[in-house]
């Protein structure tokens, strides 16, 4: 599948997982499976992937009060992938490069 990865998720929790366990979190195409996600990460960042876990996050219901009354809607469901890299591999999202050695810092 083309375009399995949509963008990396860079929240506080995801950053903590990256620093401690070399796990990276991505928003992915809802139709992508684990093998496609693994191949996309390996090709894009040139790293070895140890495992891939996926979660389907439910879309939230939204309400807005307007002059015409209550407008209700729902955000779409989306899929998140947590990718664990093999020992020693890292991804630099800001430079879009990967290194197999030690992390800079």
UniProtKB/Swiss-Prot annotation:
SUPFAM superfamilies reported for this sequence: Ribosomal proteins S24e, L23 and L15e
Keyword set, alphabetical order: Ribonucleoprotein, Ribosomal protein, RNA-binding, rRNA-binding
Molecular function, one GO term: structural constituent of ribosome
InterPro entries, per database record: Nucleotide-bd_a/b_plait_sf, Ribosomal_uL23-like, Ribosomal_uL23/eL15/eS24_sf
GO BP, sorted A to Z: translation
Signal peptide: none
One GO cellular component, as annotated: ribosome
Presence of keyword Ribonucleoprotein: yes
Domain of life from the UniProt record: Bacteria
Subunit structure comment from the entry: Part of the 50S ribosomal subunit. Contacts protein L29, and trigger factor when it is bound to the ribosome.
Family annotation (PANTHER family): 60S RIBOSOMAL PROTEIN L23A (PTHR11620)
Family the entry assigns: Belongs to the universal ribosomal protein uL23 family.
Function, as annotated: One of the early assembly proteins it binds 23S rRNA. One of the proteins that surrounds the polypeptide exit tunnel on the outside of the ribosome. Forms the main docking site for trigger factor binding to the ribosome.
Protein name, per record: Large ribosomal subunit protein uL23
Source species: Chloroherpeton thalassium (strain ATCC 35110 / GB-78)
Lineage: Bacteria, Pseudomonadati, Chlorobiota, Chlorobiia, Chlorobiales
């Amino acid at each position: 599948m083309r375009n399995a990865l949509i963008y990396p998720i860079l929240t506080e929790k995801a950053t903590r997982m990256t620093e401690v366990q070399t796990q990276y979190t991505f928003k992915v195409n809802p139709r992508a499976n684990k093998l496609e996600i693994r191949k996309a990460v390996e090709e894009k960042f040139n790293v070895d992937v140890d495992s891939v876990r996926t979660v389907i996050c439910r879309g939230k219901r939204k309400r807005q009060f307007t002059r015409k009354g209550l407008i209700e809607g729902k955000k779409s469901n989306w899929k998140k992938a947590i990718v664990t890299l093999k020992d020693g591999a890292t991804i630099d999202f800001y430079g879009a490069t990967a290194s197999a050695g030690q992390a800079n810092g």
